[in-house]
Structure formats: structure tokens, C-alpha cells
Amino acid sequence: MTKKGARGSVSLTAEDWVRAAVEAISEGGVDAVAVEPLAKRLGVTKGSFYWHFKNRRSLLEAVLGRWEEEETEAVISATARVSDPRERLVRLFDEAFADEPFGGHTSGSGVFYGRDFEQRLSDAADDPVVGPVLRRASGRRVDYLEECYRALGFLPDEAWHRALLVYAAYVGVQRLAREVPSRMPREDDYVAYRQHLISTLIPDRTSTAAAGTGGEAE
């Protein structure tokens, strides 16, 4: 379907609806994904929606599938190609904490995930559509972190504990940016904070060897 503007008709695609839904979630939560408000946002009738999606659930599933692929699987695939275990973790931190948690970021495909997008999903963790995807993505992230720490030389329990600690830091930064933004670092201070996270949570090889063996590094 098309929408009419000052320059005539512009074709709308399923991608347009997905992007509008992502914006709506960032601004108002999962409940904001509703056909009529999204149609108004895009400047079209509700009938346009049904050319691309069967119902609201199918749109929400498309949004969640896109988010899971771009914000979890694509990041894992990109960092997994780094052969050095410590550098792999550093690259992962750079990806996860790349942007200040105040303005959101644009994915590789051009979808803009607003500052609160993942927190809005967390708010809807009991939703029958959102919950399973959220738990799967979060579990995948923690499991991958554990793999990275084990590759760095940590024993399974310690690798698991560090993975949980790192993911808690990631989630916590997002929540603090939403709840007490005045206490969060910005610009150069945020870069320094990210570097502090890296130096604190990713040990050098000497300390890794000691932690992994329970004794002195050779």
C-alpha cells in the first residue's frame, strides 16, 4: 500500500511497519504496538497494515525476531570471529557499551532502537509473545559470555559467575540511564567508564592464569 504526501504517493513495506513498531515500543512499551496508532504514525489507513501482517501478534513477532537477530546473534557472530579470547571480550564490550545509554542507537540495517527499547521489553517479560524471546536472547548472551570467559582460561563456575556479573552490569546501565540519568556519565566520561568496565571485568592473561588454576601464573 501507499501513503500520500506532499510529493505524491510513497510505497509502504513491512519494513516500515517494523520500524514504526520499534519506535513505538521505545516510546511507550509493548502495548503501544497497536494497528490504528501505528497507521496514524505512518499516515495511512489500517487497511495498509493487513497487506503485510495478519495481525498485531505477527508484527510483534517480526519486531522481536529482528531485534534478536541484530542485537544478539549478529553481535555474537561478529565477535566470535576474533581469535584472541581477551580481544574477543573487549570487542564484545565495545559492542554492548558502544553508545551512551541515553540516545539509543541505529542497527546495521538502519533500525533505530531507542534508549528504552530493551527495558520496555523487560517490562513486558510476562507477555506470552515477548517473554519467550526475551528469555532466549538473554540466555544466549549469558551463555556466550560464559564461553568467552572459559576460552580465556577460567574454570566453569568462575566463568559463569563472571558472565552473570557482566550481563547484570549491562542491564543495570540501561536501567540507571532510565531511572537516574543525572548520575550516569556522558560523552568523554562515558568512554572512561566503559574503559573502566573493560579493565575491571576483563582480566589480563596473568590474572586469568592465576584464577583459572587457583594458584600462581607460570
What are these model-predicted stretches?
Residues G65-T72:
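Short, basic, alpha-helical segments at the C-terminal edge of helix-turn-helix-like DNA-binding modules
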Residues V129, V133-R140, Y144-E147:
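Short, solvent-exposed amphipathic helices
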Residues D16, A20-G28, A74-R81, R120, ...:
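Solvent-exposed, amphipathic alpha-helical segments
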Residues T13-D16, A20-V63:
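Helix-turn-helix
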Residues F102-R135, E179:
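Amphipathic alpha-helical segments used for helix-helix packing
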Residues A62, I76-R115, A163-V166:
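Hydrophobic alpha-helical connector segments
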Residues S107, G131-R135, R150-E218:
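Hydrophobic/aromatic-rich alpha-helical bundle segments in the mid-to-C-terminal region
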Residues I76, L121-S122, E146-R150:
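Amphipathic alpha-helical segments within well-ordered protein domains
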